[in-house]
């Protein structure tokens, strides 16, 4: 299994913010599918391009083909509460986000987390984040 390391403000390796479509294809291969400006790779890695054709947003969903790490822990296999506790040492999330609970946006870090359901301990749902993303400066403004 591949391991993609998140470098805040820079990359979800090997894809870097600011890369061109050709550069992305050279490091990760041809996309599985393309929807508008969003290119999908490896059953879970999504790359969005801006109007100049440069990467502005990289999102990694949970996948059987790769794991995504940040600050030494696996984002999709670590309890969301623990992820938030650790990331809040680096910055704070937007408490006014209308989807708070489902999503956590750390604007100063250009980092976001998302899950499709709120935590339900009895059902065991919503305990982990389904996706993590980084973006170019100003994307979350």
Task: Label every model-predicted segment.
Residues 1-141:
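Short helix/turn-capping signatures at newly exposed starts of structured segments
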């Amino acid at each position: 299994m591949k391991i993609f390391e998140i470098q805040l403000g820079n990359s979800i390796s090997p894809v870097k913010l600011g890369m061109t479509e050709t550069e992305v294809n050279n490091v990760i291969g041809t996309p599985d599918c393309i929807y508008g400006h969003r290119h999908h790779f490896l059953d879970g890695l999504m790359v969005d391009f801006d109007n100049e054709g440069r990467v502005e947003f990289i999102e990694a969903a949970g996948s059987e083909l790769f794991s995504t790490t940040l600050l030494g822990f696996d984002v999709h296999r670590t309890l969301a509460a623990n992820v938030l506790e650790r990331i809040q040492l680096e910055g704070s999330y937007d408490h006014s986000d209308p989807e708070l609970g489902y999503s956590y946006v750390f604007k100063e870090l250009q980092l976001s987390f998302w899950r499709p359901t709120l935590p339900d301990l009895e059902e065991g749902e919503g305990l982990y984040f389904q996706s993590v993303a980084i973006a170019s400066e100003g994307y979350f403004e």
